[in-house]
């Protein structure tokens, strides 16, 4: 077939048959899973998976304990305690990553607003965040969005209510986790996440070339649709 010829389209059934015939070593899949559990700090799950699969983690699982404590604090909204623990483990981390420090401080402001501590929130914003807002337009915008929650009787239902969702805490934790791993010269992004990003990149390249192919439209469920 010449390069000028249009390749035959492949149906979803044909694509699924090719996938089913592709042999992937179980050990390789298990290593991907273990890598994800360790990188994300899921110690108990990693220990259980090691017993079930026989795959050894790349690091001593005991080294995950401090990251687990930080994660628990952030997901509970105990931001000041998390900052103190980060500083005790890596005194220079927040000094050298000012944007991360701002996000932690911003999250503490969100927690004060969640608890309806309006005066404390305003004072904290003025004394701890105002200077960073003056230095960074991006920080100023984020601080203004956060303080805008105070203008609503039901901030959870406001246009800025996403800041009060639990996913906001998870977002901050993910940023902290990556920063800590980078600081410790460890892998900060799970290999599985890198593979998914590669998949999205490949699909985007095909879309731009107007290629019709069975496309994965839901990564979390592995949903593949017919070519369109």
Curated annotation (Swiss-Prot):
Coiled-coil annotated residue ranges, if any: none
GO CC, alphabetical: cell junction; cytoplasm; cytosol; nucleoplasm; nucleus; ubiquitin ligase complex
Tissue-wise expression: Up-regulated in colorectal cancer tissues (at protein level).
Gene Ontology MF, one: protein homodimerization activity
GO BP term (any one): positive regulation of canonical Wnt signaling pathway
Localization in the cell: Cytoplasm; Nucleus
UniProt main location, coarse: cytoplasm
Domain called CTLH: residue spans: 63-120
Record InterPro entries: CRA_dom, CTLH/CRA, CTLH_C, LisH, Ubq-SigPath_Reg
Interaction with CTNNB1: annotated span: 116-212
Residues covered by the LisH domain: 25-57
Source taxon at top rank: Eukaryota
Post-translational modification: Polyubiquitinated through 'Lys-48'-polyubiquitin chains, leading to proteasomal degradation in the absence of Wnt stimulation.
Keyword line: Cytoplasm, Nucleus, Ubl conjugation, Wnt signaling pathway
Keyword Magnesium: no
Similarity field: Belongs to the GID8 family.
Role noted for this protein: Core component of the CTLH E3 ubiquitin-protein ligase complex that selectively accepts ubiquitin from UBE2H and mediates ubiquitination and subsequent proteasomal degradation of the transcription factor HBP1. Acts as a positive regulator of Wnt signaling pathway by promoting beta-catenin (CTNNB1) nuclear accumulation.
Complex formation: Homodimer; may also form higher oligomers. Identified in the CTLH complex that contains GID4, RANBP9 and/or RANBP10, MKLN1, MAEA, RMND5A (or alternatively its paralog RMND5B), GID8, ARMC8, WDR26 and YPEL5. Within this complex, MAEA, RMND5A (or alternatively its paralog RMND5B), GID8, WDR26, and RANBP9 and/or RANBP10 form the catalytic core, while GID4, MKLN1, ARMC8 and YPEL5 have ancillary roles. Interacts with RANBP9. Part of a complex consisting of RANBP9, MKLN1 and GID8. Interacts with CTNNB1, AXIN1 and GSK3B.
Name of the protein in question: Glucose-induced degradation protein 8 homolog
Source species: Homo sapiens
The organism's taxonomic lineage, starting at the top: Eukaryota, Metazoa, Chordata, Craniata, Vertebrata
Gene: GID8
């Amino acid at each position: 077939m010449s390069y000028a010829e249009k390749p035959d389209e492949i149906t979803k059934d044909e694509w699924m048959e090719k996938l089913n015939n592709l042999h992937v070593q179980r050990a390789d899949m298990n290593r991907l899973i273990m890598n994800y559990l360790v990188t994300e700090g899921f110690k108990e799950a990693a220990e259980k998976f090691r017993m079930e699969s026989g795959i050894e983690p790349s690091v001593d699982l005991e080294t995950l304990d401090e990251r687990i404590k930080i994660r628990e604090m952030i997901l509970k909204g105990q931001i000041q305690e998390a900052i103190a623990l980060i500083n005790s483990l890596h005194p220079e981390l927040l000094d050298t990553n000012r944007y991360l420090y701002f996000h932690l401080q911003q999250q503490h402001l969100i927690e004060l607003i969640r608890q309806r501590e309006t005066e404390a929130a305003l004072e904290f914003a003025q004394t701890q965040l105002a200077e960073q807002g003056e230095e960074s337009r991006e920080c100023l915008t984020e601080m203004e969005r956060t303080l805008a929650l105070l203008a609503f009787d039901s901030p959870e239902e406001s246009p800025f209510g996403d800041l009060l969702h639990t996913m906001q805490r998870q977002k901050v934790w993910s940023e902290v986790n990556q920063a800590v791993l980078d600081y410790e010269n460890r892998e900060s992004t799970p290999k599985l996440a890198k593979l998914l990003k590669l998949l999205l990149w490949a699909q985007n390249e095909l879309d731009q070339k107007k290629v019709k192919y069975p496309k994965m439209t839901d990564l979390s469920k592995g949903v593949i649709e017919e070519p369109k």
